[in-house]
């Protein structure tokens, strides 16, 4: 039987909306403090969606086996008469008595040992399942609806759906992170919650570099039971994730809603290049779907990655996620409908080692200049090496992005770059008027 969706009745709420605040993380490898987060004004309460506002209940995974008491087999000694005259021989029985058990080295029977191992294995997965309880309450299904006409000129609704994540609650709206491709050019957006309550949502803002977007739901459309059962996502630190760490993929990692899969992180060093930035990817050994979506959860019940299969290597359907720490500021800006300053280049780091080998100056090597971007308008070209933004020296794309975040749309910044000519590299400056994303 098909379960009919529960359509929510409006419940009036009078809370004053507050600004969304997503606290950043410190990258232990950078030696730099995280960017300051945008905080609410004194008249509005700050909303913390990192999970620090409420203690995250986590279950420790214990895969150790309990000590078993060692049973000892009684060795019976029997003395029998020897056929030889006047002689006796003491013999030790090496065969177990009929009906007795044969014990292994550790004192357990083979059957008991196998049963114990299986129970420990089962308990391990049960513990891993339990740590996903709070993250699962933050998951929703986002549906993009368009009206189309069939061959017989009959109207019908075409629906596409994907996982969404509640990243903030300002007392008036729930802010849901999802992929823009599902809501682009649709006529209606709906969100389904944990109890099958279905409500309309509105588009807030999207980021073209990552393909992520925020949609929001008016909380007055949800009844008290639905609100009590949901949670704001506990966002962890992806900077603490290492190769080999266990993770649980939750949502629709294999293309089916409300599914989970277990695995380990196989790589934390892969990156994706985006306009004016780059993001780390968390690659796992979990086989997923090209249409998979959802989250990656660590054993503390914290979300460390957003599944984005569009970034999975071609021909390789393993579950891949964008590291959460690097997009927290982006999530905050999208939730607050704040534009980000834009120059329009893709770049890569020129490390000291690479500089020594190639003679390219240290800095950010431009691999692409976006068409009609502020960078192109200012005269910047591919293979220029950016060394300063304003008065601040930049040697990595991360430093470049951090400095870029200090500017607003319309600001004019002087970009210093090195350009190769007939006599080697020469310094050039470009006055760039910041665009808007």
Predicted ranges, named:
Residues 156, 161, 333-403, 411-437:
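PDZ/PDZ-like groove recognition
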Residues 120-130, 146-175, 198-200, 232-234, ...:
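A conserved glycine-rich beta-strand in the N-terminal activation segment of trypsin-fold
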Residues 117, 216-237, 243, 424-437:
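C-terminal, low-ordered peptide segments at domain boundaries
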Residues 234-257:
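Short glycine/Trp-rich loop-beta-loop segment that forms part of the substrate-binding cleft
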Residues 97, 115-116, 127, 299, ...:
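C-terminal cap/linker of serine protease catalytic domains
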Residues 149, 157-158, 186-188, 222-230, ...:
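Active-site loop architecture of trypsin-fold serine endopeptidases
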């Amino acid at each position: 039987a098909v379960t009919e969706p529960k359509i929510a009745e409006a419940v009036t709420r009078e809370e004053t909306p507050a600004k969304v605040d997503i606290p950043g993380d410190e990258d232990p490898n950078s030696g730099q403090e995280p960017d300051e987060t945008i905080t609410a004004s004194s008249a509005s309460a700050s909303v913390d969606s990192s999970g620090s506002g409420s203690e995250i209940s986590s279950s420790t995974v214990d895969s150790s086996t309990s000590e078993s008491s060692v049973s000892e087999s009684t060795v019976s000694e029997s003395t029998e008469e020897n056929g030889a005259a006047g002689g006796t021989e003491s013999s030790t029985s090496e065969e177990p008595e009929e009906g007795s058990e044969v014990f292994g080295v550790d004192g357990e029977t083979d059957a008991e040992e196998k049963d114990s191992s299986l129970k420990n294995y089962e308990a391990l997965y049960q513990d891993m399942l339990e740590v996903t309880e709070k993250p699962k309450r933050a998951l929703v299904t986002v549906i993009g609806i368009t009206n189309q006409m069939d061959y017989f000129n009959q109207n019908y609704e075409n629906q596409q759906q994907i996982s969404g994540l509640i990243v903030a609650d300002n007392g008036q709206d729930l802010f849901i992170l999802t992929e823009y491709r599902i809501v682009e050019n649709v006529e209606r957006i709906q969100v389904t919650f944990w109890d099958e309550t279905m409500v309309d949502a509105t588009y807030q803002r999207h980021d073209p570099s990552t393909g992520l977007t925020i949609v929001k739901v008016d909380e007055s459309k949800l009844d008290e039971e639905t609100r009590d059962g949901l949670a704001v996502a506990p966002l962890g630190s992806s900077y603490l994730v290492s190769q080999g760490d266990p993770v649980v993929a939750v949502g629709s990692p294999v293309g089916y809603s409300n599914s989970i899969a277990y695995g380990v992180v196989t790589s934390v060093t892969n990156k994706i290049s985006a306009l004016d930035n780059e993001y780390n990817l968390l690659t796992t050994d979990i086989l997923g779907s090209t249409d998979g979506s959802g989250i990656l959860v660590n054993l503390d019940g914290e979300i460390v990655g957003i599944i984005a299969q569009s970034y999975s290597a071609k021909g390789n359907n393993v579950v891949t996620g964008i590291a959460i720490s690097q997009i927290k500021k982006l999530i905050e800006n999208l939730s607050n409908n704040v534009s980000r300053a834009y120059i329009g280049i893709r770049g890569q780091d020129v490390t000291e080692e690479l500089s020594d080998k190639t003679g390219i100056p240290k800095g950010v090597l431009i691999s692409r200049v976006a068409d009609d971007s502020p960078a192109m308008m200012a005269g910047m070209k591919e293979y220029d090496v950016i060394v300063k933004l304003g008065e601040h020296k930049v040697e990595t794309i991360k430093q470049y992005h951090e400095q870029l975040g200090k500017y607003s749309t319309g600001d004019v910044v002087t970009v210093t770059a090195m350009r190769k000519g007939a006599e080697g590299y020469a310094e050039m400056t470009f006055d760039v008027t910041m665009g808007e994303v």
